[in-house]
């Protein structure tokens, strides 16, 4: 890819988006029984921050959790950054899920797209978001959270920002959890 100033002048096209690797769930996590698993479509997607701010799910990492053959089906929420590369990685993960080429015992319930900056995303990003909206049961967008840049731990900010609170509420409704 060539970059002139802040404009991309050439885009490297891969034949297919990269698949998300699969990693067996360690035996010591056998006692963990989360409502769902946060799965990053790439490193730095924001799963641990969303996990801390919402207090929901289990942040597994940038790979599919692989469960034992006799396991029940586990729900997953995919997370990516609102960048061309982040959404390309999300396209690969969603494609794996749709084609059933990823691990068994995993059901994708949606994709959370986390802003990469406070600026309006480029056209390629908004186009990929629109495409993925048709491929996943749910798609949420979380805006840029400037306050998190100064936080040692996401929960240090106190109440979650409004769009994160709305995401939490939507997830609770999705999984039919009574809200207190």
What are these regions (language model features)?
Residues 1-35, 169-178:
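Extreme N-terminal, non-catalytic leader segments
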Residues 34-58:
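Glycine-rich phosphate-binding P-loop
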Residues 51-52, 122-135:
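Short, aromatic/basic amphipathic alpha-helical patches
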Residues 62-82, 97-112:
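Inter-motif core of Ras-like GTPase G domains
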Residues 75-91, 116-122:
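Conserved Switch II/interswitch segment of TRAFAC-class P-loop GTPases
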Residues 112-119, 145-147:
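Short beta-alpha junction loops
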Residues 129-157:
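Beta-strand-loop-alpha "switch" segments that mediate conformational coupling across diverse proteins
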Residues 153-168:
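C-terminal boundary of histidine-terminating zinc-finger modules
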